[in-house]
């Protein structure tokens, strides 16, 4: 069996090396490779289907979307699309409800309302016997997502005849967690140093940070936590908030909101208080003042991520308070601004005779219903600590009155770092499709997350990032596939690993069937292979 696996991997890599266009590429473009289509007939087909465009861009995000579309089409088709104000045959109509009354009139109001802020429609229609393709959203953010999807259709050689796509994200907050330290190092990072050039911020605006935001937007990620969960209190000092605001300015055009981790003892460490007791009025006021200051610098600040009373981190239990009391105190400060709090449910102490597997469950289950409505309990996919295989965390299905956020680890802490090809979409899918049997059969983790979204509009999923300063972003090329897979499954938790992997291979390498089949197969068996050899 081992010999057959090695032989297959070698043959797959040989096929990969035959794909001429990957030579001399660094991997920097990720899955957004808008290279000229080589098939002459196919290229001509897409040129005809994009003969002209009606797209009036007025806002910053609309201009970003328009630039993305024009650059993508020019790269893929080798020409600049003709802009017009009149509808012509094979015209592309692009806009949102506010910017294009014409497009709005083509679709029913109920369907447009169902898109929300981030959903979109791509559809073939006829206007006065003229064939057109409509790309429409309610809001600018949805329009940007629609543009990326439209380019993906061409990039992956899909037919535009009779196209009908409607996409609405199933999870509201789709957030990367960066375990980046303020000195530029990354805990569990295997792809270089932090992308955030703190020493030169806020005045230096890195193109790489813009490209990072663009890549995230292309897969639907809409938030990023800048710093390590093992937090440094000085990240909340004014000079560091100004630096974070510089990053937020770079991310904002792509719809990426900035979050920060906060150290629970910050009132003592940087606020000159003698306590961080969440019931102390001075402590409460300190957090209110700090949050107000943050929103002055970052008006669309997302909120905080906090690790408390775990692995030596300070927390409310230091003062005899519960996790709910500690979380609610900070959540109250965030609430007037629409901010949210991710409170990690990964808690354990280095004590003998304590079953680490059940610690989180025992601490948080009794607190169900005691957390404020803008608090998420950020819960790892398994009860131990990002192992190659774990059952789903027992809190899922057992806290019906508390919003839980699912936390995956994209960086490969226990799966070979950046030295082993391990495709994580099967791991993500395994967790999401696990049946918790909380209310009978069919109550999967995915459904639990989506139910939060449907009932209270609060749903979230987080991924510990594998991104760094390496030119290929993730230390090795297939690490990009894990970043991509997280974004796609965060948008739609019911996608399959097979579908997501094929999409990534087509966008990153080639649309040749032999290349797709070989690389996809290698990816899909890699996680199971890693589990087997790491257990053995």
Can you annotate each of these PLM segments?
Residues 22-128, 161-162:
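Acidic, contiguous N-terminal accessory segments
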Residues 156, 296, 314, 321-536:
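Substrate-binding groove of N-acetylhexosamine-processing glycoside hydrolases
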């Amino acid at each position: 069996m081992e010999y057959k696996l090695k032989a297959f991997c070698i043959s797959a890599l040989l096929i990969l090396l035959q794909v001429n266009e990957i030579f001399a590429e660094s991997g920097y473009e990720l899955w957004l490779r808008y290279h000229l289509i080589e098939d002459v007939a196919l290229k001509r087909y897409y040129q005809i289907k994009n003969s002209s465009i009606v797209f009036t861009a007025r806002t910053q995000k609309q201009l970003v979307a328009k630039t993305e579309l024009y650059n993508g089409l020019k790269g893929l088709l080798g020409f600049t699309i003709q802009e017009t104000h009149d509808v012509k045959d094979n015209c592309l109509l692009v806009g949102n409800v506010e910017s294009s009354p014409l497009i709005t009139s083509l679709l029913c109001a109920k369907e447009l309302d169902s898109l929300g802020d981030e959903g979109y429609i791509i559809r073939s229609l006829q206007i006065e016997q003229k064939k057109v393709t409509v790309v429409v959203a309610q809001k600018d953010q949805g329009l940007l997502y629609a543009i990326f999807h439209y380019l993906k259709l061409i990039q992956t050689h899909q037919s535009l005849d009779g196209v009908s796509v409607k996409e609405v994200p199933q999870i509201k907050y789709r957030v990367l967690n960066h375990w980046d330290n303020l000195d530029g190092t990354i805990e569990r990072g295997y792809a270089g140093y932090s992308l955030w050039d703190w020493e030169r911020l806020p005045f230096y605006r890195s193109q790489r940070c813009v490209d990072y935001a663009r890549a995230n937007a292309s897969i639907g990620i809409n938030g990023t936590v800048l710093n390590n969960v093992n937090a440094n209190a000085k990240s909340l000092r004014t000079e560091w908030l100004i630096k974070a605001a510089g990053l937020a300015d770079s991310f904002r055009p792509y719809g990426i909101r900035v979050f920060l981790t906060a150290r629970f003892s910050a009132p003592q460490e940087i606020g000159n208080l003698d306590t961080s007791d969440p019931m102390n009025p001075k402590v409460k006021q300190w957090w209110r003042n700090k949050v107000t200051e943050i929103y002055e610098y970052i008006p669309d600040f997302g909120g905080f991520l906090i690790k408390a009373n775990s692995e030596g981190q300070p927390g409310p239990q230091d003062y005899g308070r519960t996790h709910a009391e500690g979380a609610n105190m900070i959540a109250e400060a965030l609430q007037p601004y629409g901010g949210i709090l991710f409170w990690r449910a990964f808690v354990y102490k280095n004590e003998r005779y304590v079953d680490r597997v059940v610690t989180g469950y025992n601490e948080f289950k009794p607190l169900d219903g005691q957390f404020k409505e803008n608090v998420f309990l950020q819960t790892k996919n398994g009860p131990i600590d990002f192992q190659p295989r774990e059952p789903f965390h027992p809190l899922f299905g057992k806290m019906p009155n508390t919003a839980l956020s699912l936390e995956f680890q994209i960086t490969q802490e226990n799966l070979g770092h950046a030295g082993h090809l391990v495709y994580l979409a099967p791991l993500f899918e395994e967790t999401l499709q696990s049946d918790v049997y909380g209310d009978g059969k069919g109550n999967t983790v995915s459904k639990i997350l989506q139910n939060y979204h449907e009932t209270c509009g609060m749903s979230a999923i987080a991924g510990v990032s594998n991104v760094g300063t390496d030119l290929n972003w993730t230390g090795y090329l297939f690490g990009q596939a894990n970043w991509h897979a997280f974004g796609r499954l965060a948008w739609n938790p019911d996608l399959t690993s097979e579908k997501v992997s094929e999409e990534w291979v087509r966008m990153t390498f080639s649309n040749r069937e032999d290349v797709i089949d070989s690389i996809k197969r290698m990816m899909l068996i890699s996680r199971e292979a890693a589990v087997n050899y790491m257990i053995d």
